[in-house]
């Protein structure tokens, strides 16, 4: 418990002290309300007509990790006094990119390699920096990529334990090793996977794979996981941070031709929907979000069934991005109640 919380509890025996504390807190909050003045957004290339960039709509795609990262972004922004509205679980990139372009969304968690494949299927960048540069060359002028996080989560071709055993596949095997056996395998993934370069199109053109059939499921979620476990599909597109891979002894095949590219987590924003303060906040999040932390949080959400919002807040606090204090509104409520004790 913080010293703030301790002092507020001890004041129950001294109503006068509680009144002073409450008055001081109200004064402090009033002063802080003026800390984010309109001057903060002057000459700000990211701020615009949408409440000065301080009324932010954070969206997410239709899978668990995207929702989790959106919660991380949103709670970090809220801690800086920015009003946040969540629009979770919207759908695929084909939908959310358009919503960003028209300003319906302000912020969206993205994966740089997949975004580039969507914008330019022929691009073959060799580094994170060249990936970002290639995206910027194709990105709509109303949008902006912020800093990439060290955290990566790639699409993959993953097989179940039975398939791995049957065809002698291990974690050292590659997607290319499926060429002769793919005609016997059903692959499952999101509906969009069927027509994406980072999907069946690329698996055929880059690796020469022709699967027996394709089963439309979800984006690496419970439907795909269950189908792979039950052998309804023998191969699937799972995200490499998916905790069920280890739990179910699935085998992720290597991607030596880099079809799935770099997949750093990276905020994509609508320029007029986010202030510089908001951009700086998200860049601070990206600086601390690594793959180890993302794996841990994914396991908490997907295996332990924890609320992603709670998981997001806990990580932000541990990373020093949320104040380890009682929230001001909670403090006022506590102090206000204690005045009546």
Predicted regions and their residues:
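Short beta-strand-to-loop elements that line the ligand-binding cleft
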Residues: 84-91, 211-219
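Short, well-ordered beta-strand elements
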Residues: 52-65, 82-89, 183-188
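Ligand-binding cleft/hinge of the Venus flytrap
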Residues: 73-80, 173-213, 314-318
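Bacterial lipoprotein signal-peptidase II cleavage site
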Residues: 32-46
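A conserved helix-loop-strand patch within extracytoplasmic ligand-binding domains
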Residues: 128-186, 275, 287-291
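Periplasmic-binding protein-like
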Residues: 142-143, 149-155, 242-286
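Short helices/loops that flank or line small-molecule/ion binding pockets
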Residues: 71, 75-76, 94-105, 201-206, ...
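Ligand-binding "clamshell"
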Residues: 119-146, 232, 244-257
């Amino acid at each position: 418990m913080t010293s703030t919380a301790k002092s507020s509890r001890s004041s129950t025996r001294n109503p006068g002290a509680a009144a002073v504390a409450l008055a001081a807190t109200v004064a402090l909050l009033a002063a802080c309300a003026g800390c984010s003045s309109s001057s903060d957004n002057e000459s700000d290339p990211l701020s615009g007509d949408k409440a000065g960039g301080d009324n932010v709509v954070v969206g997410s795609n239709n899978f668990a990790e995207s929702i989790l990262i959106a919660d991380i972004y949103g709670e970090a922004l809220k801690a800086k006094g920015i009003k946040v509205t969540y629009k979770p679980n919207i759908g695929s990139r084909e939908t959310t990119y358009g919503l960003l372009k028209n300003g319906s969304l302000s912020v969206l968690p993205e994966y740089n390699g997949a975004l580039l494949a969507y914008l330019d299927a022929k691009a073959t960048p060799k580094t994170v920096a060249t990936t970002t540069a290639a995206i910027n060359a194709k990105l709509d002028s109303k949008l902006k990529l912020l800093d990439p996080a060290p955290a990566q989560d790639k699409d993959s071709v993953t097989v179940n334990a039975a398939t791995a055993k049957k065809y002698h596949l291990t974690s050292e095997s590659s997607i290319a090793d499926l060429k002769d056996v793919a005609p016997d395998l059903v692959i499952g993934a999101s509906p969009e996977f069927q027509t994406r370069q980072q999907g069946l199109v690329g698996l055929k053109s880059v690796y020469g794979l022709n699967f027996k059939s394709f089963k439309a499921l979800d984006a690496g979620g419970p439907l795909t996981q269950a189908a792979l476990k039950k052998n309804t599909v023998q191969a699937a597109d799972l995200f490499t941070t998916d905790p069920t891979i280890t739990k179910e002894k699935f085998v992720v095949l290597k991607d030596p031709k880099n079809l799935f590219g770099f997949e750093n987590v990276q905020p994509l924003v609508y320029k007029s929907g986010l202030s510089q303060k908001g951009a700086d906040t998200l860049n601070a999040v990206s600086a601390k979000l690594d793959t180890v932390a993302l794996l841990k949080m994914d396991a908490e959400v997907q295996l332990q069934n924890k609320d992603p919002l709670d998981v997001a807040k806990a990580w932000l606090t541990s990373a020093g991005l949320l104040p380890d204090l009682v929230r001001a509104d909670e403090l006022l409520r506590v102090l206000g109640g204690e005045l009546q004790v």
